[in-house]
UniProtKB/Swiss-Prot annotation:
GO biological process, one term: lysine biosynthetic process via diaminopimelate
Upper taxonomic lineage: Bacteria, Pseudomonadati, Campylobacterota, Epsilonproteobacteria, Campylobacterales
Name assigned to this protein: 4-hydroxy-tetrahydrodipicolinate reductase
Protein location: Cytoplasm
Protein family (similarity comment): Belongs to the DapB family.
Function: Catalyzes the conversion of 4-hydroxy-tetrahydrodipicolinate (HTPA) to tetrahydrodipicolinate.
Length: 255
């Protein structure tokens, strides 16, 4: 039985992880990490700890859905107490991503901006479409609930990277995050990423390929956050058997 520690237990996905782990086979919840206290009751056999080392020692693998600053703390602690990590936290900055890569030299880490099977497949389709539809303009629109803090979403940026790599482009040089005023004509290499926020939308991503006379839109809609929690549990079961290294959700799903 693989023992899982949940980091970010008070968050939306963290709470779902705890519920979904109760129904999982060959994998169980052993510990949760909180900065102050847990917002809800939990099985007394599960360790609830504010001490990072105790939390890590009580589990075989960690699933993280927290905030970038908290994820950074986890990575720094895991370097000293290596554990396989499934990281679903989005909005990581360059320093935090470098820390993640450094940590993966000593432990297996699966990092994904979206844990769903559908988005993993969408990334592959976007890469293929981008390569095949040369001359088509690429625009990406993402929609999320009004409480989401980072924009654009990590998923949208991953999709943009897939589109850019399909054409051999450097996303940092062609990405557009917004348009306003008299900006002139659209550059043919532009990949625009737009973010909308409102209501309780779990997540919707649309990647459009637009040409004169026709267009194609690929989209994915998440209707429940259980998609992310179940995907993370599947990833944890897979990662527990792996050697040190940095893995993606596509590696796990063999897409």
């Amino acid at each position: 039985m693989v023992k899982v520690g949940v980091f970010g237990a008070n968050g939306r996905v963290g709470k779902l992880l705890i519920d979904d782990l109760k129904l999982s086979e060959n994998i169980s919840l052993s510990s949760v990490y909180v900065r102050n206290s847990l917002d809800f009751s939990i099985d007394p056999s599960v360790l609830v700890s504010t001490d990072m080392k105790s939390f890590l020692n009580a589990c075989d693998i960690v699933i993280d859905f927290s905030l970038p600053e908290a994820c950074e703390d986890l990575l720094e602690a895991a370097i000293k107490t290596p554990k396989p990590l499934v990281i679903g936290t989005t909005g990581l900055n360059a320093h935090q991503l470098n820390l993640l890569k450094q940590a993966s030299e000593n432990m297996p880490i699966l990092y994904a901006t979206n844990m769903s099977l559908g988005v993993a497949l969408l990334n592959k389709l976007v890469h293929q479409a981008s390569a095949a539809l040369k001359g088509f303009d690429i625009e990406i629109v993402e929609m999320h609930h009004k409480h989401k803090k980072d924009a654009p979403s990590g998923t949208a940026l991953t999709l943009a990277h897939s589109a850019a790599s399909g054409r051999g482009l450097d996303l940092n040089k062609v990405r557009v995050s917004g348009r306003d005023g008299n900006i002139g004509e659209r550059n043919s290499d532009e990949i625009a990423v737009m973010a909308l926020r409102g209501g309780d939308i779990v997540g919707r991503h649309t990647v459009g390929f637009y040409n004169d006379g026709e267009f194609i839109e690929l989209n994915h809609t998440a209707t429940s956050r259980n998609t992310f929690s179940k995907g993370a549990i599947r990833a944890a079961s897979w990662l527990a058997k792996k050697e040190a290294g940095l893995y993606s959700i596509s590696d796990c799903l063999e897409i």
